Amino acid sequence: MEEKYHPSPDSPTEIPFHPAHASYLKSLVTQAGARDPSHLIFGADRHKYKLNPPASLEEVRRFEEKHNLLLPEEYKFFLTQIGNGGAGPYYGLYSLEEAERYTEYLETTQTAAKQKDEEVPAPAFIDRRMTPEDWAVRMEELDNCSDDEYDSLMYKLCAGMLVIGTQGCTYDTVLMCRGSERGKIVYIDWNLEPGYGPFFTGMPFLYWYEMYFQEILQDHNLTSYGYLCLKSEEEFVKDFCEMDKKTGEEDNNMDFPPLNKEQLLSSLFRFKTAAAETIDFLAALKEPELDAMRTELLFRFDLHRGREVFEQLLSGSNPDAAICCARRLP
């Protein structure tokens, strides 16, 4: 399948893998470092907005051959033209050498894992066709299997998956190299809970990388980068108002993964301030199941309006939501 670059509106070129774009991304890293000189943004004290020297094409090819993996073109462009790891979301990006430490279940396919004499690429398990039930069943299998069976199941689970960075604790950043999400970023919690599967950001690698630094330059909240959609305030209000008008057929044609109203509303936590129109929208919103979240957002953007809505909820319209909001406030 042909890979396509998804530029931001500020990108200098829409030509994939152009040298000008490599220069542009390096410039974004430098600008972000100047905006955060004390490295206060989460993870910045680790990578310090520094990129490693680029890898050679030969180094990339050796990595691919060793792991029977075809790396996405965007990622190869990054490695060879921008940097072999370094500055990036959360604690930054691993170099190919660092990524080697996390390839235990990548070095062989499910066939090679059993027979040690074949290398047939295994299909990606982490794929948009995977349902929450599929994930839960696989996790239950992992909990109730022998050591040999565990390794075999993990090879299947990790097929086509390359860990390229960490968010801390048990959360890692994964670049998918096979399946529907090839070239896109997925977040995974290695606690491997049956009820909590991988998070599909839906973002191609270069877009995910670029927008992280754009968010820094726009002084947005980076706490949950990649988990929250990167819409503007205007786009958010427009899309939210149109959600009730969409048919099931239209939902099926949406970019993956589709968002529900709660997920869309939560995207506003990226912003430290909001326009008067956004504040008015939140104050007037009539969605009882979203009352706690919209009130928390109002407290963030306009303390007076937040207090007004909070008192309305507490006095009778939705006291449970008011209590929930109070518990979530710092």
Regions found by a protein language model. Give the residues of each.
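Structural detector for internal amphipathic alpha-helices that build alpha-solenoid repeat scaffolds
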Residues: 261-273, 292-304, 312, 322-330
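A surface-exposed partner-binding patch
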Residues: 2-163, 287-290, 299-302, 318-320, ...
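Long, contiguous interaction/recruitment modules in multidomain scaffold/adaptor proteins
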Residues: 135-248
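Short, flexible helical or helix-coil boundary motifs
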Residues: 1, 32-36, 113, 216, ...
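Charge-rich, solvent-exposed alpha-helical interaction surfaces
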Residues: 24, 28, 239, 267, ...
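Short amphipathic alpha-helical segments that mediate assembly, nucleic-acid/protein binding
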Residues: 21, 132-138, 233, 261-262, ...
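Amphipathic alpha-helical scaffolding segments comprising HEAT/armadillo-like alpha-solenoid repeats
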Residues: 243-252, 273-285, 303-315
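Alpha-helical segment of the N-proximal tetratricopeptide repeat
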Residues: 238-273
